[in-house]
Amino acid sequence: MNSSPVRRSALLAVGTVATLVTALCVWALGVQPEGPDDPDPWDRTLGGNPFRLASTALAPTASCDALLDSYRERALELVGPWGWEGQEYYFDGPTPLRGDAAADTASGTTARARTSRAESSETGTNVQESGVDEPDTVKTDSQHLFRLHGSQLTTYDVSGAAPVELARLRLPDLQTGEMLLHDDRLVVIGAGRGNDPTTKIITIDVSEAAAPQITETRSVTAAPVTARLHDDVVRVVVRNGLPELDFRHPDDRRGEVGARRHNERLVAATTLADWLPHIDGESAVDCAAVAVPEDPDTELGTLTTLAFTPGDDQHRAVAVATETEIAYFSGNRLHLATAPSWSWGPPARTTSSLIRSPGNGHTQLYSFELDGLDTTFIAAGEVKGAIADRWSMDSADGVLRVALGRTLATGNFNSVVTLDEQDGRLVERGRVDKLGIDEEIKSVRWFDDLALVVTFREMDPLYAIDLSQPSEPKLLGELKIPGFSQYLHPLGPERMIGIGQAAEPDGTTTGAQAALFNVSDLTNLRRTDVVTYPERTQAGAATDPRQFTWLPEQRTALTVLTDNWDGRTTWVSALKVRGSKLQEKRTAVAYGADASLVRLVPLSSGKVVLVTDDEVSFFDVD
């Protein structure tokens, strides 16, 4: 870590050191420091101190003034004569390194690890974790269907022979969003209208589906990231980037030195209102609930998690003074990961945004325990490599498992690493390296004692990794086949479907494909059948798993398919599993550019609702 002890103490702002340093900087710039707009809220944190287990890697500051000083100090390093400035531009993600090393394979012919079946949530959404519902544009209670299209909510009765529209409700100031459903309340989370990043949280009473009523609206001055529903608790993650300031650029009247000094004065005069989110004019998070990372390379911004129960106007909040969009929720954990640093083009000259610095090829991890409305910091750590997205993380029995892609800090391979929570730190417990030499991770699926990882460059290695002993993860087997799977869906202990792209032997992709795998023997993985779709097609589940639906009673998978490389037709591909084979039937369901809106929602009656841009109808699976 390129940080001296003085630098660390300044970033953590423990005591008065950071306050003094920033005050001197502000004084030198000719600007009087301003405190927070609100009275010091140090003792107002609901639910106790969320950082009572804070470590040196992530800790709250000593006061609101110290928190503001830490923001200002870090921001002054990012400002220049053109405003917020980036560094020299290059990609610090997967890098085409070369090597001949091979992964070690575990010996033995049997394994404890097994796959298990994944099903849609009770509200009809294909989710990552069982029991943790995810937002979507369509939700159901099996009697009614609720659809959000832009700012319009439409309710339907789906208990009869055909869906019947019941009501429409316009949601004011909402540009686009998604929903969570709990009992008779919908919670809509989405982007508000206007130029400034805003998250709208709208609660709607749908106890009378024919007359939905808005019961509460919250406006958060931050951009939406994601949301989850745990039992009756909604958690919404929002982010604040670098603030919009009235920066000046060099011109005939002002040179670079003058522009830089002007811009530095603006940064030094920022208040907490510029860095922290507000809800309807009030501070959304207390100073005591905001922690500052130790790592000086961490992106500057604020990531806030809001927790509340639908119908209750109170919330609890916790925040980390960084910016990322990678958030993974398990049943009792929230894990945040910083994104790999990357950029391209000429040096950045922006008024505001996420500025990606060159970084060091490491990923920072922050783990929180979820208990009711409380979101409590548990541990933080650092790993070498890049975490692509939330699907690259998993949590089981207090162990965080991550799939890591290549960066400048790693070898020319991918890895699976397990980490323990120990005294506020995430400590590496075990690892498997040398997965996919010179290849990129395309998909990951986790189970209690197993990870399935797909990498690709010219061939598609599918790796099975035994995680039953977190301190000694083992590579059980691998399968190399053309093409690759971008989404893996387990059907049970013996079968798995992969949705992705077919490819030529040289790695050139040709079109979408669906593959059926036999995973009953993890030391001998087999692809038993493959459906290859027409050239230049794409499968929606490859980028949005909510466009995949598994119907266990019918032994049928439904996936959305488009020809949007050069056309505008959307199909539903019904894949019936018959032993080791796939029987495919394709139905054109929509035309136009809105293929991403198509959903296939299973009902408890056995029917499936097809939602397109134009209509809502029942889909004939047979």
For the regions a language model picked out, list residue spans one by one:
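Beta-sheet-rich non-transmembrane sensory/scaffold domains
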Residues: 2-622
